[in-house]
């Protein structure tokens, strides 16, 4: 999720926006070289906070165009953490909430994740690790079977070229390309025998 937050930040920086990423992850030290390199390269402000009040103070005093909150990760069955996230998100007047899921997850797991995080008023999904699976039918299934749009696709480690807006055309192209790839055809035959 943290890498995804920075990829999203880079999109806005390239559009000449002043961006801040605020980490609310209490379980991890963010003083790592990847974050330092990214903030130096793109000019993204990076801060850590522990509460809504700290977040609001950071946003109000920073003069940024966009603040991206990188919340602590939690599993779909961690009800107390989901409730904490819900309580946090409800305090904001203007907040767009994206749920980050992996393309390599099974459909049932993504549907369960969407259901369990629905109390957060999630507006869309960001699908990561698109490059790590050859079975992208999950993108179509999620699009048809959940009320959420897929907003972004993450297809690799590059902050700029491997993160894009998810359009219906792009999703359809990826699914159709998947079915025509020789490796996919071989694995599909093996799975059906």
Task: Name what the model sees in each region.
Residues 7, 11, 141:
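Active-site signature of alpha/beta-hydrolase-fold catalytic machinery across serine-
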Residues 19-30, 39-81:
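Switch II (G3) loop of P-loop NTPases
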Residues 29-32, 137:
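Short, glycine/polar-rich helix-capping loops at beta-to-alpha or helix-loop-helix junctions
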Residues 51-60, 76-181:
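Conserved catalytic-core segment of NTP-binding enzymes
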């Amino acid at each position: 999720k943290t890498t995804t937050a920075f990829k999203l930040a880079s999109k806005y920086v390239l559009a000449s926006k002043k961006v801040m990423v605020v980490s609310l992850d209490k379980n991890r030290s963010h003083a790592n070289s990847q974050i330092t390199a990214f903030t130096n390269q793109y000019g993204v402000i990076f801060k850590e906070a522990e509460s809504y009040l700290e977040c609001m103070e950071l946003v109000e005093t920073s003069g940024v165009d966009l603040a991206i909150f990188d919340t602590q990760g939690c599993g779909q069955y961690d009800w107390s953490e989901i409730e904490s996230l819900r309580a946090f998100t409800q305090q904001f007047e203007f907040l767009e909430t994206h749920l980050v899921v992996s393309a390599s997850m099974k459909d049932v797991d993504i549907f369960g994740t969407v259901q369990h995080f629905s109390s957060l008023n999630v507006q869309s999904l960001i699908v990561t690790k698109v490059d790590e699976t050859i079975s992208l039918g999950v993108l179509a299934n999620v699009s048809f079977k959940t009320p959420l749009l897929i907003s972004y696709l993450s297809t690799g480690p590059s902050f700029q070229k491997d993160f894009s807006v998810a359009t219906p055309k792009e999703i359809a192209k990826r699914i159709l390309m998947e079915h025509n790839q020789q490796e996919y055809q071989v694995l599909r035959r093996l799975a059906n025998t």
